[in-house]
């Protein structure tokens, strides 16, 4: 398969170099971050005993590549991870896509032992340099739709103080060189995922999510929008239906998820509420019915009724849910309120699971390169499909109201402002 049309732009970039850009850890802590006095902390304790055989610290490399990530994943990341794993050098990996300072893939690699870190880093640098030399992205993000999109996201997602760290001389977001890569600090979002135990669980899940997306990129025609949207919707239904077995709880979650993505960017043209009803109607009856069958199968624990690809995801989602429930019941999850005002220590899985489900869904969609509009639309589609099938309240399904949008400010809803610039999503 070929890269998307953007990669055929006529201005090739310079060759790959690991550049020495700014250190993201120097950015100020956002309002939704974790203040020094917070109990939400990371796993590293200076007084902890050293274990030579324990996994090393995560390495983070940002690969600035203004094209489809598919060739980067299949021709570089997967072979690199496979080789390092086979040689006993790697304890884990995952990736996310991001746009800050230009479109890039954030690759996270955890050495099997601390002593392996230099080798893992060198091997990653060598593989990335070779790939970018042989398959450079030809599109430059200097003007046009993508530049405007990134500038809009920059304004919406970061405070004025945070933006100052990333401004160029022209007052716009600084762009890193295309076809380059940089080592950056790894900065887990402890407040979002529930502290060190929650971050460890998220990292385990992120590898499964990354593996799934790499396999989908290899075996499916994800360059076709219909295929991509259909896959994402089914994955969302599997995981959300596994986490939330009660129809009403699931519908409430989907409504809030939709309302957040739709309302957070309501001042832009990146969501289109007026088109949801028409697009849903044009789907016909077969797709909504498929979503309802998926929901029924996972709610009943009858994953053998699912296609193999979804069955594996359902089994992983169930294990992820069980591990999250165990952490909750032990009191090992501590979240930070989105306004940064307090810590939240849930002891009831009914409270904790939706708080984790939001970023879990979003980050899998991120790896699939889904857009803001996609997330708003698909959560609307899934909720409406369930309502049309009789789930929850027997009322006519409509797009969530302003009251529903307001509810996203409560615990468990995503936040669009004041995110950590080096965070994991």
What feature does the model see in each segment?
Residues 1-8, 32, 38-425:
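An acidic, charge-biased composition feature
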């Amino acid at each position: 398969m070929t890269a998307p049309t953007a990669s055929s732009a006529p201005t090739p970039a310079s060759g790959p170099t690991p550049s020495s850009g700014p250190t993201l850890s120097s950015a100020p802590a956002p309002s939704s971050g974790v203040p020094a006095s917070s109990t939400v902390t990371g796993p590293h304790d200076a007084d902890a005993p050293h274990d030579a055989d324990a996994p090393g610290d995560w390495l983070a490399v940002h690969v600035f590549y203004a094209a489809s990530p598919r060739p980067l994943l299949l021709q570089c990341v997967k072979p690199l991870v496979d080789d390092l794993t086979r040689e006993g050098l790697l304890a884990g990996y995952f990736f996310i896509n991001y746009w800050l300072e230009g479109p890039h893939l954030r690759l996270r690699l955890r050495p099997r032992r601390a002593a392996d870190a230099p080798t893992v880093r060198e091997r990653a640098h060598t593989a990335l340099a070779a790939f970018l030399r042989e398959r450079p992205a030809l599109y430059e993000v200097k003007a046009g739709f993508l530049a405007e999109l990134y500038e809009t996201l920059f304004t919406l997602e970061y405070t004025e103080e945070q933006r100052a760290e990333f401004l160029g001389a022209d007052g716009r977001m600084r762009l890193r060189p295309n076809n380059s890569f940089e080592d950056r600090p790894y900065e887990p979002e402890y407040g979002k995922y529930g502290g060190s135990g929650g971050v460890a669980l998220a990292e385990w899940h992120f590898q499964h999510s990354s593996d799934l997306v790499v396999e989908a990129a290899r075996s499916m025609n994800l360059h076709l929008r219909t295929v991509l949207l259909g896959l994402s919707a089914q994955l969302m239904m599997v995981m959300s239906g596994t986490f939330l077995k009660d129809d009403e709880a699931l519908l409430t979650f989907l409504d809030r998820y939709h309302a957040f993505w739709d309302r957070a960017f309501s001042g832009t043209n990146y969501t289109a509420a007026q088109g949801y009803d028409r697009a849903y109607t044009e789907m016909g009856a077969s797709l909504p019915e498929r979503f309802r069958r998926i929901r029924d199968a996972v709610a009943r624990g009858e994953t053998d009724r699912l296609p193999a690809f979804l069955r594996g995801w359902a089994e992983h989602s169930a294990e992820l849910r069980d591990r999250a429930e165990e952490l909750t019941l032990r009191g090992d999850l501590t979240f930070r309120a989105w306004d940064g005002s307090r810590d939240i220590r849930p002891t009831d899985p009914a409270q904790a699971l939706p708080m984790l489900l939001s970023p879990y869904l979003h980050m899998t969609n991120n790896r699939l390169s889904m857009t803001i509009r996609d997330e708003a639309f698909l959560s609307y589609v899934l909720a409406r499909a369930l309502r049309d099938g009789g789930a929850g309240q027997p009322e006519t399904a409509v797009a969530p109201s302003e009251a529903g949008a307001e509810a996203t400010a409560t615990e468990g809803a995503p936040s669009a402002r004041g995110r950590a610039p080096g965070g994991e999503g």
